[in-house]
Amino acid sequence: MELKDNALSSGSQTLGINARPVPQVRVALPDYWTFAGGWLGIKGHIAYGKFTDDGWQKDFTDQKSKYTEDALYHSKAGYLRVGHAEKTRLSLELGLEMATLFGGTSYRKWENGQLVGVKNGTGLSSFWNAFIGGGSDVGEDVYKNVEGDNLGSWVARVNYDAPTWNLGVYADHFFEDHSAMFHLSHNGYGTGEEWQVKKENRFYLYDLKDIMLGAELTLKSCPWARKIVVEYLYTKYQSGALYHDHTANIPDHLCGTDNYYNHGIFTGWQHWGQVMGNPLYTSPLYNADGTVQVKNNRFVAWHAGVSGSLSRALDYRLLATCQKGWGTYGNMFPHPRRNLSLMAEATYSIPKSGWQVAAAAALDKGSLLGDNVGLQLTVVKKGVFK
């Protein structure tokens, strides 16, 4: 997870760490490769893989609602850093993260209520379309979209490194299509026999409302509160509440109701029932009706995290999140649902042994996730067993 603290952040919206990892082949520049005298740096990756939750999807849905088999995975990301690490305290990081779920077989209900499997593309052209965001899905005719479930985030971070502290302020803007990626869509189609012809250079502009904003403060000489993170997330807009494909009679083309993390053909941005981005999007694993879909993707949330050391051997971590959810555009909650999540963790490192023992306690309170309590014990060995 890039440009955010992996231990304290609520998580990236595209390439998060909430779900089981997807087995993949990856080519990457994991650290910044600098040029222009050290003032510029780039890093990134390209990856292809295969999802492994076919059996889970069949069991969870009982093969009575939409699921996929043998789906493939693609992700890519590129980041640019501006600023010299040794000559300036200020630096800027910009990035684009994108991912695609494609291939395999999609099982979904048709108008007669029967569950029918559709074989998606798996040839070289499908791998290329996943990379460039092109092509169209099997069965699409009049209204063609790109092949697979495509999504991503524009990310940015400004850093200031002072002698005794470091501050990073960052943003993560998620998108599911061009309306949120570029904030515009073509809206100049003709009518009648020319309803599929782009007659005018007219575009519909979309607001920048959905965003994740965060601040990360590191106190270099304060071990008891070494790092503090605060984040705000807003996802209610989703390019607006209206969706309309242009027709012969009504040429207006509106691309709203983006329905984050869901997809009409595939089972959305999830793996083994857990969303693969930010966990504040309610994971399908919580669904009591056995459907693989995200039922709450329109929400406002505040998140905070603090970590530090109480002694040389004892570290701690505290997380707190409050959230208000409205469901989805297609299935709104009758009343907004709220949730409060808290977690406290302590980690003890046994001196000169390589052993660590961590204990954590967490709870959820509210109507969004219900009232839950959890405990976790972790034992870690670093180095060689003797």
Q: For the regions a protein language model found, what residue spans apply to each?
A:
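Transmembrane beta-strands of outer-membrane beta-barrel pores
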Residues: 1-2, 31, 48-54, 96-102, ...
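Internal, well-ordered domain-core segments that constitute the primary functional module
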Residues: 2-118
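Extracellular loop and loop/strand-boundary signature of outer-membrane beta-barrel proteins
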Residues: 9-15, 61-66, 140-144, 198-203, ...
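Outer-membrane beta-barrel "beta-signal"
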Residues: 24, 371-386
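Short loop/turn motifs that connect adjacent beta-strands in outer-membrane beta-barrel proteins
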Residues: 32-44, 81-93, 160-168, 219-225, ...
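Membrane-embedded beta-strand positions of outer-membrane beta-barrel proteins
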Residues: 44-46, 92-96, 167-171, 228-230, ...
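Long, internal scaffold/assembly segments composed of regular secondary structure
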Residues: 92-94, 102-247
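C-terminal structural cap/anchor segments
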Residues: 235-328
